[in-house]
Amino acid sequence: MKGLLLIILLVLVSPFAEAEMREWKTADESKTLVAEYVSSRDGKVTIRRKRDRRTFTLDLTALSEKDQDYVRQREDSPAGNDPGEAGDADGEFAKLLTGDWERAEGHGLKYRIFGARKLRKGKGPGYPLVVYLHGRGGDVMTPEEPWGARAFTRDDNYRRRTCFVISPQNPDQQGWVGTKADGVVEIVKELLKKLPVDPDRIYLTGYSMGGYGTFQLLSQEPRMWAAAVPVAGGGNPGAVRDYRKVPIWVFHGAEDKVVPVGQSQAMVEALKEARSEVKYTEFAGAGHGVADRVYDDEKLHEWIFEQGR
């Protein structure tokens, strides 16, 4: 019980942005939070904080009588009125959902985006979002489909795992750091507002420089990602505790001469020491070019889309 109360206090003690949706209170009415109702069942309620869109599931009894009554009313109301249902795609963003790779720009970055036309209409909690970070020298803005990211949009795969996919363009090819990493995060936040994206199913992956970027963004925004797949990359082993609870599957070629395999090995070892349930696949005899081997593997896609926050 003490652990539960600590979680509730941590959730509610944070300062919040201007009022929107409704104000929630703890049972003793000492702490408040502005958030939206998402769902409830079996004596628990899930709410989404306005400030950063984080979701929390709390025991109903930990909230005020007024909040408990509100939740019961929500449960009795028609499902179509549930604010937890994803809304429809907004304006100009809806036009980007054509069933083909379209071009967009925002927050200092150009990017490609893919989504089927049917994703213009919200359904349930929304659809997954996959973020793919290219390697050094990569150009996702050519007429071709973005290499690496296109594996998620192939017809046979997409029919079973319908989702949004974005691939940002790194403007200077000098790593997914600084304003470039910030730009990726801001694009994701904007898409959460403008498209029916499920905030609990946002997946991050990248190859080579993008593999480094994957670890960087895990460290920068650990609560944003439902799963991550760094391929032939590396990162800072000292930062892994921040995201040790995120499901991660690391891939590397044992004979990589561009990014030594020790880069991934060090990250995996640090994650294991932090008690992460990290998965690691090392391809014997393989060099740096393992991306196709990774992204063409059906087991990888099955694993990614099984994950949720």
Residue ranges and their predicted role:
Residues 16-101, 105-108, 161:
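Compositionally biased alpha-helical segments
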Residues 76-129, 207, 217, 265-268, ...:
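A domain-start/cap signature at the N-terminus of enzymes
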